[in-house]
Amino acid sequence: MKRKKMIIGTSCIFVLLIIVLFGASQYMLDYSLRPKNRGKNLESSWQYMFKTYSYLKPWIDSLKQNQALKDTFIYSPDHVKLHAYYVASSRPTAKTAVIVHGYTDNAIRMMMIGYLYNKKLDFNILLPDLRNTGLSGGNAIQMGWLDRKDVTQWMEVANRIYGDSTSMVVQWVQPPL
C-alpha cells in the first residue's frame, strides 16, 4: 500500500514536471520567435535611420524623388508574400549586393550598408525584408532556417532585375539590438 502511494506520488510529480517544462518551452519559443518586433514599425525605422545616420536622408530623398528606390514582392514556395527594396547603381554595372538584416530588424535598417554599396562602391543593391518584418508576411521570425531559402530566391530576383551576368555579394548584418 505504501509502495503504491509512493508510485502514484512520484508519477504525479513527474507529470506535473513535464507539463511545467512543456509550458516553459512554449513560452520561450513564442518569446524568441515573436518578440516585440521593431521590424514591423516602418516609420520608426526611418526615423531611427535618419537620426542615427544623418547622411542617409538626402540620399533617400533623392532616390524617392527620382523614383530610384523601388519595391518588389515575391511569394516563397510556402506562399508567404515577401518584400524587398532595390536601387540600381548610378552607372551600369554587373556588381550587385543583397543586404540582409538581422533579428527583429527590417530592410530599412540596412540602408546605411546599402548607401555604402550603392553610393560609394557603385553596386546595385537589393534589401529584402525577411519573414514577419517590414512589408513581408509571415507569422514568426525564422531565425535563419527558412530565410536561407528566401535569400537564395532573392538572389534569383536580383539576377532578373540586373541581368544574368551579375557578380553578387550577400551580406547578412546583425546590428546591436
Where are these predicted regions, by residue range?
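An N-terminal hydrophobic leader/cap segment in hydrolases
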Residues: 16-73
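The serine-hydrolase catalytic nucleophile loop
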Residues: 103-117
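N-terminal Sec-pathway targeting helices
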Residues: 1-18
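Conserved alpha/beta-hydrolase
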Residues: 114-137
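Short beta-strand element of the alpha/beta-hydrolase
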Residues: 94-102
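A short loop-to-beta-strand scaffold at the N-terminal edge of the catalytic core in hydrolase folds
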Residues: 71, 77-88
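Alpha/beta-hydrolase active-site loop
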Residues: 141-162
